[in-house]
């Protein structure tokens, strides 16, 4: 039986240099070490986000089940270098992830992506299908615009407003619609997120510059989803006010080998709001 280990951000923190468009980027990642298979966790695009901040409730469950867990800070977030993206952010993240995996000598990995991370996982699967084991997509994956909710959604408007005016008040406004139960957003969590945001004002400024240069950072790959043959698990929050539920349905319609699970009483952060059930669901899916 595998010993239960509690992993920390500091103990798993590492860096790698990756070439992107002729520029060398220093990319931060967390790595739990050797495992039977590799599981890569890709975070969303919110201000102050990082691999660890998005998935700290999930790391131990996967690592203690025998997986090597890697959490990548995408360029422009966390401890990675900042960047202005004038093209597809999804494809940029996919290329950087390939560079990270190449450097680490990892030929194949399962990808778990939340929001922007889902978009990036889909872009990676389209460009490098032979490198993907299974896909797990939560609240993202470029299924196209909602058919029922005007775009940009309430949550995306608040997210973009927070980037432009990074205050505690605006952070609270965004987090209050980020999850189903806003009372779980403690003052400590909000302060930590605010500190993470303000520690890297270059990330905030470059995100706004990127939006100005190209408002469509995450292109719609809905018409190409049928090319992805990897088994996929699509997970959504019924009450997601950032990326509505019908976008998840479009993913399932497009992906030829997909399953779909909806959490009730859940917003945009399924892996955090329903961590225990989420963790077991992924382990069951990966073990099939």
Swiss-Prot record:
* A Pfam family the protein falls into: Abhydrolase_1
Top-rank EC class of the record's enzyme? hydrolase
Q: Say if the entry is tagged with keyword Thylakoid.
A: no
The annotated site for Catalytic role in ketonization of the dienol substrate (substrate destabilization) falls at 193
Q: Which reaction does it catalyse?
A: (2Z,4E)-2-hydroxy-6-oxonona-2,4-dienedioate + H2O = (2Z)-2-hydroxypenta-2,4-dienoate + succinate + H(+); (2Z,4E,7E)-2-hydroxy-6-oxonona-2,4,7-trienedioate + H2O = (2Z)-2-hydroxypenta-2,4-dienoate + fumarate + H(+)
Q: Which InterPro entries match?
A: AB_hydrolase_1, AB_hydrolase_fold, Epox_hydrolase-like, MhpC_alpha/beta_hydrolase
* Domain AB hydrolase-1 as annotated: residue spans: 39-274
Gene Ontology molecular function: 2-hydroxy-6-oxonona-2,4,7-trienedioate hydrolase activity; 2-hydroxy-6-oxonona-2,4-dienedioate hydrolase activity; protein homodimerization activity
Question: What is the protein's given name?
Answer: 2-hydroxy-6-oxononadienedioate/2-hydroxy-6-oxononatrienedioate hydrolase
Organism, by scientific name, is Paraburkholderia phymatum (strain DSM 17167 / CIP 108236 / LMG 21445 / STM815) (Burkholderia phymatum)
What gene name is given for the protein in this entry?
A: mhpC
